[in-house]
Regions:
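FIC/Doc superfamily catalytic core
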Residues: 1-200
Length: 200
């Protein structure tokens, strides 16, 4: 749960995000969110690559995933948030920093023609940077993972995160703020060439 006193995104006096179904029980909201997002991610997996790996692409993924749940879907947060005493990027700099980061990705030719080792290294870098940015009030991890899944697909890889336990990935993601080595190792293990995956 994010730390943000008197959040404009929550029902007054609670940590429950204002949602389109007006669900005020946090467990019920989490369960509803999980079921909806599962279907949305499945739909995206059938669509292939849905953008040009720019800001618009990243934002559109968040909007698609969360538009049936939260009114802020596809909108950058307008308050600062923290988790476990770590404060994510200040909201005023989100858009400019995301533009800078994805321009850097473009300058790297979207990681084309890299060895698997180098691809995993650069993928872990972008995962870590997007994590620090945390552009949205909720749904950052799922948006980032889908964005990087599509980036992997563009480069001929299937990014199968089910190969590593969610807890290991979470711990590596947290640690990636200062060291991406574990995240890089896990992402390498999760990457398979599309042709090999297809014929299994």
């Amino acid at each position: 749960m994010y730390e943000s006193k008197n959040s404009v995104y929550c029902y007054k006096g609670t940590n429950v995000l204002v949602n389109k179904m007006n669900i005020k029980d946090p467990i019920a909201l989490k369960n509803y969110e999980t079921s909806v997002i599962g279907l949305k991610l499945m739909a995206l997996s059938k669509q292939g690559i849905t953008g040009k790996f720019d800001v618009s692409h990243f934002v559109s993924i968040h909007k698609f995933l969360f538009e049936d749940i939260y009114p802020f879907a596809g909108l950058f947060r307008t308050e600062n948030i923290a988790k476990d005493y770590f404060q994510f990027a200040e909201w005023e700099y989100i858009e400019s920093e995301l533009i800078r980061l994805l321009s850097e990705l473009k300058s790297e030719n979207f990681l084309a023609n890299l060895t698997k080792e180098k691809f995993a290294e650069r993928l872990s870098y972008y995962w870590a940077e997007l994590n620090v940015l945390h552009p949205f009030r909720e749904g950052n991890g799922r948006t980032t993972r889908e964005f990087l899944r599509q980036l992997s697909l563009k480069n001929g890889y299937v990014l199968n995160l089910h190969k590593v336990s969610p807890q290991k990935l979470l711990n590596a993601s947290i640690k990636s703020i200062i060291d991406t080595a574990d995240l890089e190792k896990y992402l390498y293990a999760c990457l398979e060439k599309w042709s090999h995956y297809f014929y299994l």
